[in-house]
Amino acid sequence: MSYYAEYRKECFDIDTFEDENGLFATKSIKEEKRLHIEEMWVKPELRNKKIGQQYQSKIFKYAKENGYERVSCTVNLYNKHANETLAKFLNNNWKLGWTNGDYIGLIKEVV
């Protein structure tokens, strides 16, 4: 685990998973039974290999095993890949959860 991941866990209770393909980070919103995806990043040369989908599968499996009812994420509208990212999430049955200035929040039920 990197120092940055340790810092985020200690100070913000954010769990980080890193492997040779990239990383993702999650935060538990216990009072809402929701697991929030804080960040997900895949190495550029691997982005056509469905690594993000594999990460989502791991996140949803963890959420189901730990009693979460929903998984959420936010997309920063100023990210140069925002349109593509939103389209992919919405195409995979994520629903609009909220908007917050520069971000759009998405939610998906855990089944």
Can you describe what each PLM-predicted range is?
Residues 27-30, 44, 98:
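Short, low-complexity Ser/Thr-rich regulatory SLiMs
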Residues 1-4, 111:
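Conserved N-terminal entry element of GNAT/NAT acetyltransferase domains
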Residues 5-23:
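Conserved beta-hairpin
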Residues 32-44:
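Conserved acetyl-CoA binding element of GNAT-fold acetyltransferases
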Residues 42, 48-61:
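Conserved acetyl-CoA-binding loop-helix of GNAT-fold acetyltransferases
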Residues 63-77:
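Conserved GNAT acetyl-CoA-binding A-motif
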Residues 77-98:
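Conserved active-site alpha-helix within GNAT-family acetyltransferase domains
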Residues 97-111:
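C-terminal "cap" of GNAT-fold acetyltransferases
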